[in-house]
Amino acid sequence: MTDMAQSHYQLGMNYFQGKGVERSFSEAMKWFRLAAQHRHPRAIFMLGRMYDKGTGTTENPAEAAKYYLQSAELGYPRAQNVVGQIYIKGRGVPAGYEQALHWFRKAADQNYSDAQYNLGLMYAKGHGVPKDFIEAKRWWGMAAEQGNSKVQFTLGHMYLIGKGVKKNYSKARQWLRQAAEQGLPTAQYHLGMMYARGTGVLQSYTEARQWLQKAAEQNYLDAIYQLGKLLSSGSEEVRDPSSAVVLLKQSATRGHQRSQVLLGQHFAKGVGTAQDYQMAYHWWTEAANAGNADAQYNLGIMYLNGKGVEKDSLEGKRWLTDAADQGHTKAQYCLGVMYSTGKGVPQDMDEAFRWKEAAEFWESL
């Protein structure tokens, strides 16, 4: 690779990024092509990327694969990793685990952490090789030691749930914290939940709030919900119902069902906001229509009691049945009582027994 090739590549990158010049993908491609004529692996890779993404040219997976392979064959580990990925997906090339493994291993042997992660995934899933969590963990360990946050999270989560390894909360916390400190929201969320639940650590709502807040700021919906829940019902030092309502609205409006259920409860009880049964009904209906059993149960009770809606035993029974069919024990007990007393439905002791028995079964699990 000549100095001229490197200069051509750098000029191409300047045009690609708009660095010191007006951004121009056509100019970038021109200079990448000139560098590629001198077998510059990164320039060849960038040509592949431009065809892959349709940047400054028509998207062409086959043409992208051609350039990625050329770059990979010149030993560029980033290209080797991408070639492994396109063989997994069958994008521009015939799908094949054997070829994917070949290229992931080449990049992994150069300590390219993303390839080590992907190679570990192949072993974890048994794609093209016998399933082997020990080998997966070995490759992930190499990547994690290099600071790859995605792999650090994967290892932390494995130790947290005991998947492929014996549960080890100390190691889970170690790897999750390393990934969380690099800003990975999934790691921040799980670390926050360890502190919220006291899983392998001294329970600390303050610490939980800190990590959940970081993930929530990156729009991680489960973190927004759990932070809202913590502020809604956590210990005195973190409880802030009005802030909980603000947070829950953020995730509820984006379709997060558990947020919709909890937000409905805030409106129904008037906690952190003015009591508003219509808003409770609105959010519970959103979640119930999406199949959430808790919301279906809440709507059923609303209709039975006539709070926020006109009293309607048939509509109440319909929602309770939807929830009960999903194994919601409170809904099953409620149906059992309705059928045994004949309240809102014709008395039917067989149905009463069936629903109460179902509730007892689910509670015994």
Regions found by a protein language model. Name each.
Residues 2-4, 8, 17-19, 24, ...:
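Short helix-capping/linker turns of helical repeat alpha-solenoids
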Residues 10-17, 46-53, 82-89, 118-125, ...:
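Hydrophobic face of amphipathic alpha-helices that form TPR/SEL1-like repeat modules
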Residues 22-31, 58-67, 94-103, 130-139, ...:
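Structural signature of tandem alpha-helical TPR/SEL1-like repeats
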Residues 34-35, 70-71, 106-107, 142-143, ...:
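Canonical positions in the second alpha-helix
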Residues 333-336, 346-365:
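Leucine-rich solenoid repeat scaffolds
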